[in-house]
């Protein structure tokens, strides 16, 4: 299930070993609760995910909404916007595509950015998330999907019992303010 506030994925039913479908996405009790959500449950975060030091990008001063830094597109970032949407269903897949025009007036980033995010669930149960953006001028674009998963279904077991394995050769180091240092490990 998705909602257009923040282009959020809020529920994903997956069959367990016995074939019983259970929700593996953590979320809030009801749709109204997302209006006060500080954790961005299931939200599309952008135009930039993560922190920007002192809210500065060249000559552009962004909102400093995380102490002296800027995080997740600011207080009016994409997770706090209502998106337009379309749905499509075929024999192979079902999808929802959210669209939003992000402007300097709404988020403070340069240019008029046409953003799209699609959630597609195919017949085999594979979820694909696709994000695209086209802007009228040079700007920052580094969104993410802020979905919290608990693969035990209905959050029956704590996340500390999960193992995450990433196929990467390096990770980017963060400093104590959770800002990228530029060093790779």
What is each of the regions a protein language model found here?
Residues 1-185:
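Surface-exposed acidic/polar loop and edge beta-strand patches at domain peripheries
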């Amino acid at each position: 299930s998705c909602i257009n506030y923040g282009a959020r994925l809020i529920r994903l039913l997956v069959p367990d070993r016995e074939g019983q479908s259970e929700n593996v996405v953590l979320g809030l009790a009801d749709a109204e609760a997302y209006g006060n959500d500080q954790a961005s449950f299931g939200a599309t975060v952008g135009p930039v995910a993560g922190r920007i030091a002192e809210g500065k990008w060249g000559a552009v001063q962004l909102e400093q909404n995380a102490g002296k830094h800027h995080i997740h597109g600011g207080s009016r970032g994409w997770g706090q916007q209502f998106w337009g949407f379309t749905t499509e269903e075929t024999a192979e897949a079902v999808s929802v595509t959210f669209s939003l025009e992000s402007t300097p007036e709404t988020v403070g980033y340069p240019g008029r950015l046409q953003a799209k995010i699609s959630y597609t669930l195919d017949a085999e149960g594979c979820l694909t998330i696709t994000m695209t953006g086209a802007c009228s001028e040079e700007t920052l674009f580094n969104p993410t999907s802020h979905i919290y998963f608990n693969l035990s279904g209905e959050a029956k077991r704590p996340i500390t019992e999960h193992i995450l394995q990433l196929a990467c050769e390096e990770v980017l180091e963060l400093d104590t303010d959770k800002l990228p240092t530029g060093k790779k490990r």
